[in-house]
Amino acid sequence: MRNKKIFFWRTVCIIAFVVVLISFKTQSEGIALGSITVSEDDRPAQWQNIIAKEFNIDRIKLIVDNKEIQLNKADILIDENKNIMIPAYIFPDTFNCAFNAFDDTSVTLQKGNIIAILDTNNSYITVDGQSITMDKALVKKNDMTYINALVLKEAFGYQYNWSVTDNKLEMINNKKSENILPHRYSYRDTKRMLSIKNQGNTSSCWAFASLTALETSIMPAQNTELSVNNMVCNNGYVNTLNDGGDYTRAIAYLTAWRGPVSEADDIYCDSIYDVSSNPVKHIQEVQIIESKNLEEIKKAVFLHGGVESSLYTSMNEHDRSSIYYNNETYAYCYNGTKKPNHDIVIIGWDDNYPKSNFSVDTEADGAFICMNSWGSGFGDEGFFYVSYYDTNIGVHNVVYTGIEDANNYDNIYQSDICGWVGQLGYESDTAFFSNVYTASENETLQAVGFYATDKNTSYDIYVVENFSDVSSFEQIKYIQSGEFKNAGYYTVNLKQEIDMEAGKKYAVVIKIKTPDAVHPIAIEYAAGKATKNVILDDGEGYISYTGNSWEHVEESKGCNICLKMYTKNM
């Protein structure tokens, strides 16, 4: 008994001592306690673990180039050796680093022409062929990959400071003036490639291009083949493999969670399609890049995935002759005025690709490296070059930037299966819109999803709890604000989750501002044969110019509002 008491009080004293240590500022040579400094070498290993756990209790704030970065999926960690581990998923958008390779034990990062290779089995990293000693450059914890902050310092020139007092990591890019994009980049070079597909004698290039772009965005972490058949036939539109389509149908299908479905579950050109197959991913964000913004297109390919774009061509899968195509150099450039009629995927670029390789005169060198859906017999095993100066390449551009596991939310509330068909507004760049939904179970509202119909769109999000009629809009509660750089579909995670009671109505309200727009609200309606099956009695949507007087759009406009809610069950 006496020994147990001694052990108990000894444990209490050690814990109290460590807590006191943590309360003082960590110095470079150790932890200061009054006038005494306990060096790292003299600290027991148990202390290091306790200290690390203490730092990780509170979320570590990340500031990069004086801007706070929001971490949604995972937080920064401090390990027992005070290594600062940053979740890998933020590297493309936060640090402009591309993942050329990614698996459970190794990662290849690229920024500009600098390439860094990290491996969990090595006590060093390789930067442009040179080894730099570094313990724990890469770790995996709770199915999340983390990269040591030292990698950013040693490989890409970042300076950083961790404030113990504020629990804050500040990082500064000392190489801001350097171009993040190399002069040439291609998924073929980085081995981030899929097998070339063949649409055959159908008009489904739009679906092949959409899903190929999506598949490359899922890579290099995962390699999966997705069902074109399901996208074409299960998207809410009146559609067959020969009817054609465009990226808006693809976005509607994916953001409605009807797909993407595995190719193994719904094979291409099968006579029937499977409505029961579950999506293998949930698509939460799709960006539409500004027309002819070549640098932003390259950046999207570099950081996220292939960019779906379009061409005009008189060629097809069977007839590959054209005055605009050089069969010997696999180079294409159309300089006429006809609108696009074929979708492809941009998977790279070469700024120095000679203009002499094209069969028509072009302004200068430079070409996108593109992937077609006419089988490996076309071009260079299915790939070809399209001049930067082609009339249509880069006019319509789509990249999938928000791809999450299919268990991210439990429920989706929506009334716009066909997605963004048209737009509403009040001849102004600003408007309010809302959808009202009845909670099926006791749930928490965690996120909302809606379209930005053009670039630089800003928004305010509000919620109305226990909605009954339009008078309930007087009780709107402000949640948060934000801005989108590009047009597209976006999911916004709410900073304040809302508890929802089964059977009660809840309204999400968006105030949107899209510069130079006159109709900034995306809507679904029956615009023709393809959308004739649009259902209006599944939604309760409203619009307002000022937020004071509201109009029920299903009744007055014959349309649905494109505004979704995402919830989790309690």
Predicted regions and their residues:
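N-terminal secretory signal peptides that target proteins for export/translocation
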Residues: M1-K4
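Short proline/glycine- and polar residue-rich coil/turn motifs
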Residues: S481-G488, M500
